[in-house]
């Protein structure tokens, strides 16, 4: 997914479209996606997030790259509960902003986090 790596190098801001957990309607939001050693993650500060509820019930989503590439990529999200992976993501340079928002122990325990994967036949 070179196009995704290239896009996130300068700016982690993307849009995602999820399917509403209750409504079934498409929901598009702006969010950050982190490139952590070639794997892609979306996280946030501690708290309830509609995007996480949507992805928990409907893990398929569309990642919209909008800075340079302007590409819509089908993807799948998986909730990250493994503490080793969570720590690796939160310790990564790309997650430094989050570490300034809450203590790392709180981020580890309560931050929403999903790993984003792309099908092998996705463009890029």
Put a short name on every predicted segment.
Residues 46-121:
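Short, structured beta-strand-loop surface elements
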Residues 1-3, 28-29, 48, 101-102:
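A generic local structural motif
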Residues 2-3, 34, 72:
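Generic signal for short, ordered secondary-structure residues
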Residues 11-45, 61:
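Short beta-strand segments
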Residues 4-6, 40-53:
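Covalent nucleotidyltransferase core used to form phosphodiester bonds in nucleic acids
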Residues 1-15, 67:
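Extreme N-terminal tail/first-helix region
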Residues 8, 23-25, 55, 108:
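A generic structural micro-feature
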């Amino acid at each position: 997914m070179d196009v995704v790596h290239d896009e996130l190098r300068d700016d982690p801001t993307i849009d995602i479209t999820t399917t509403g957990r209750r409504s079934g309607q498409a929901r598009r939001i702006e969010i950050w996606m982190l490139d952590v050693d070639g794997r892609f993650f979306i996280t946030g500060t501690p708290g309830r997030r509609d995007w996480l509820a949507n992805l928990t019930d409907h893990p398929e989503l569309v990642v919209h790259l909008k800075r340079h590439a302007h590409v819509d990529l089908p993807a799948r999200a998986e909730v990250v509960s493994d503490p080793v992976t969570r720590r690796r993501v939160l310790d990564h340079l790309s997650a430094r902003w989050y570490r300034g928002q809450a203590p790392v122990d709180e981020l580890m325990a309560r931050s929403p986090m999903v790993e984003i994967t792309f099908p092998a036949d996705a463009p890029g």
